[in-house]
Amino acid sequence: MAHTGIRSSPTRRLATAGLALLVLTIGSGRKPAVAASHREAPRISLDPPADITDFFLFRSYEPGREDKVILIMNVFPGGEPSSGPNYFTFDPNVLYAFHIDNDRNGKAEDVSFEFRFRTEIRGLVDQFNLFVSYVGCGVRTPPCATPLPPITSLDGPGSEGLGLRQRYSVTMVRRGQRLKLAEGLIAVPSNVGPSTTPSYDTLAAQGVYPLPNDIRVFAGQRGDPFYIDLGATFDTLNFRRNPPLLTPAEDSNDDVNPFGIDTIGSSNVQTIALEVPASLLTVDHKSPSETGQPKLGAYASTSRRKVTVLTAPTRSGEGDEDEDEVSKSAGPWVQIQRLANPLVNEAIIGTDDKDRWNATEPEEERQFLDYYLNPRLALALQLVFGVPAATSGRQDLVDLLLKYEPGDKRLSELLRVDLRTPPTPLAAQRRMTVLATPPDPAGWPNGRRPRDDVTDIAVRVVGGPNYVGARAGDGVNKNFRPLTVTFPFLATPQVGRDRVHQNPPAGP
């Protein structure tokens, strides 16, 4: 099909001008993207524990810790909170990793952090060979006939009911030199319910560990921070207002959903969060205000060994960090998913190439250049709504998503952050970041925070000036659950016992 987009030079100039502010953010402390990455490719949709739903990179906005850089990876999309008896865990056969480019050569191999998990069956579940992973008699009426201690601790007294427990290690790799920062850390379990996990926030706080070099880490369940009217979006852009345009008042109100439904707001995810001093990541080991290279590029990845052999299950606890109880893996690690800017693979890369894209390195992005120059999302918007979109010749998207500066020759799909931009406190953050009035330069595409509305930003930026000016969006302006101002920043996961299969109503 021939592209039917606007082709005249004046319109092309309008499209470029409409994105000029975002292009400038790469150099001044901002930048764009598209959305999230839930089940975005055929192969990874069959592998939930390795499926990265979101990747966040930003300067910490926790008071007193603004000199830190935050990296967050979420996996396991669509986590149903009540999904017992095993709930959700990380996969011991997956290598989870963050990769950082600090010298702007487009190769995110300067600093990396790797995470490996192992699973053990223990406590009351092992003692009585119970059919559930977690057990406890906390807040309930009437009380249990036999007093079983609820899960109030990750280890020691109060952890007896934590039957399925995961420990993990953290390794930092700097230019090929490996340093194990920690091992034997405990991942926070799922939020089962008031009887089993009665003081969940207190339990989760125990999962924040201090590491050497003033690093902090968290692994465990959190509420899914991504917000979108998912059902309406994938019903061929069948939004709940036609055309899907926000009024100026609606667009400036980040606390009300004008007409959309946060479809995945009550789902949970498995989170790996890392807080690192900026000086540990910069090429010259200096702070954000002192470094001569303030721009970082990064992405998250999941990998599996090249060969996996299924084996007969062993007795619980006999596995090690390289294998779980039912499989053995060998050979080199093979990348099976990557994520930097949100929704690139979901809304830009064509279905035929999605699996191949996930397996390639970010610096190999030139082979996918046509998808950026001729975005299919823009074409879809034009076909559905009949409003001209910028469907071809989109060098502006190439500059935004694949470069540190528009003049760069190297193309690399990384999420980039300018450390010179001061973080915006959570209460003052604007979901539309640089498209807001007034602009908030500390959000996507200058890194990405959980609050940033990458769906609406993507629709407008990819659609072009007509969609920017008309304030197009999905009608969801906020997450179903409130974010926190402290590390690891994501909301308390939805409690399993109280999960109701009813989405919050559409906005007024």
Predicted regions and their residues:
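Surface-exposed extracytoplasmic segments
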Residues: 32-508
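N-terminal secretory signal peptides that target proteins for export/translocation
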Residues: 1-11
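C-terminal segment of classical bacterial N-terminal signal peptides
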Residues: 23-32
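Sec-dependent N-terminal signal peptides
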Residues: 9-21
